């Protein structure tokens, strides 16, 4: 019996470890665009792309704490880990990380024609995973994200960075 428990624990630990390794790749990709410095301007205050919505003391945020927030409060909390295709998972994480999560999710839900709730629920995940042409889905996600950004009043100021990010995140 003890041997079965040890085997089960080892198996579950491996799954958790593998999930974190996959996430590390996704997170590192997003940090290419976010940077690691503290930023305070008339729009926001952030560090590692983490805003005050996730951490009250953004200025003193450590890289480890930023990683934990990104993993637990964004990646896992919004079920991004349930997206099967790595490139789609990477793009969706970056979008949600860089935007108001509910707004990004609503735009994704509208695009894939599921009930718009603002929550990355099983219906949304299933529709994403069942999308037959991954390249087309990524193209449509990029187009939808860029079209949304064009509606923002700060678009002209940040458009070059935003366009570059969307074109190169996956």
Identify what each model region corresponds to.
Residues 16-170:
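Cell-wall polysaccharide-cleaving catalytic domain and substrate-binding groove, primarily
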């Amino acid at each position: 019996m003890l041997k079965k428990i040890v085997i089960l624990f080892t198996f579950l630990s491996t799954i958790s470890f593998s999930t974190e390794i996959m996430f590390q790749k996704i997170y590192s990709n997003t940090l290419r665009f976010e940077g690691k410095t503290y930023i305070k301007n008339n729009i926001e205050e952030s560090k590692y792309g983490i805003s005050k919505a996730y951490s009250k003391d953004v200025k003193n945020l450590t890289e480890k704490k930023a990683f934990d927030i990104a993993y637990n409060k964004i990646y896992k909390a919004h079920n991004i880990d349930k997206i099967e295709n790595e490139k789609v998972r990477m793009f969706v994480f970056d979008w949600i990380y860089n935007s108001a999560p509910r707004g990004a999710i609503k735009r994704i839900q509208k695009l894939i024609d599921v009930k718009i709730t603002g929550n990355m629920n099983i219906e949304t995940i299933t529709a994403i995973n069942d999308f037959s042409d991954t390249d087309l889905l990524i193209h449509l996600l990029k187009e939808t994200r860029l079209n949304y950004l064009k509606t923002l009043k700060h678009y002209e100021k940040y458009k070059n960075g935003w366009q570059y990010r969307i074109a190169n995140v996956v």
